[in-house]
Amino acid sequence: MKVVNSSGKKKTAIARATFKEGKGRIRINNVPLEIIEPALARMKMMEPVIMAAEAFSSVDVDVSVMGGGVMGQADAVRTALARGILEWTGDAALKEAYAEYDRNLLVSDHRQKEKKKFGGLGARAKYQKSYR
């Protein structure tokens, strides 16, 4: 039995996907992809699935995702799904299509939130100075 493991990251969210032969079921933390809320996050996760519909029809995917927020997790999941299906099929044309559509389907976005420093409300903003 063929098994492929893949992962994706976005900020502090990490998704790990396991691909096995099956009937096309995709579960995110044991929840079917079709009923994930909010809808915007679901649509974002569906992008690699829609682009490679016939490849996903014979594969069951279990994704465990932790850390981060809702959209960060959605980005991590879509990266894990895209990388995994490419490893499963080995299709160069699909890789080209993913890269042309959105490079972050294949490459994790390593940008992180800048740390807040003292003397202000955020990473760069400073408290207002008064001279009188």
Curated annotation (Swiss-Prot):
This is Small ribosomal subunit protein uS9. Transmembrane segments: none annotated. PANTHER family: RIBOSOMAL PROTEIN S16 (PTHR21569:SF16), RIBOSOMAL PROTEIN S9 (PTHR21569). It comes from Methanothrix thermoacetophila (strain DSM 6194 / JCM 14653 / NBRC 101360 / PT) (Methanosaeta thermophila). One of its GO terms (cellular component) is cytosolic small ribosomal subunit. One of its GO terms (biological process) is maturation of SSU-rRNA from tricistronic rRNA transcript (SSU-rRNA, 5.8S rRNA, LSU-rRNA). Keywords: Ribonucleoprotein, Ribosomal protein. PROSITE patterns: RIBOSOMAL_S9. GO terms for molecular function: RNA binding; structural constituent of ribosome. It holds the Pfam family Ribosomal_S9. The keyword Ribosomal protein applies. Belongs to the universal ribosomal protein uS9 family.
